[in-house]
Amino acid sequence: MTITDVRVRKVNLEGKMKAIVSVTFDNAFVVHDVKVVEGQKGLFVAMPSRRTPEGEYRDIAHPISAKAREQISVAVLNAYQEALASAIA
């Protein structure tokens, strides 16, 4: 699996949700609505999710391995930092 594109679709300077991102894998599969969120320990990547009737949030798509999660997180956070720098400049 290779991440071939990361597009930051929306950047929020205020609030805990900082960005909405789309991640493309192998130029063949895209996951939309990946979020960059500011938590207590800094920024983290939240996968797209839906709210269940019980009020819980369940991931729609998510990485299976820790290595894949790390690759996605690094790529998304790097793209977010670049988008943030160009938005401020």
UniProtKB/Swiss-Prot annotation:
Transmembrane segments: none annotated. InterPro entries: SpoVG, SpoVG_sf. The keyword Cell cycle applies. Disulfide bonds: none annotated. It holds the Pfam family SpoVG. GO terms for biological process: division septum assembly; sporulation resulting in formation of a cellular spore. Coiled coil: none annotated. Keywords: Cell cycle, Cell division, Septation. The keyword Cytoplasm does not apply. Belongs to the SpoVG family. Could be involved in septation. PANTHER family: SEPTATION PROTEIN SPOVG-RELATED (PTHR38429:SF1). This is Putative septation protein SpoVG. It comes from Heliobacterium modesticaldum (strain ATCC 51547 / Ice1).
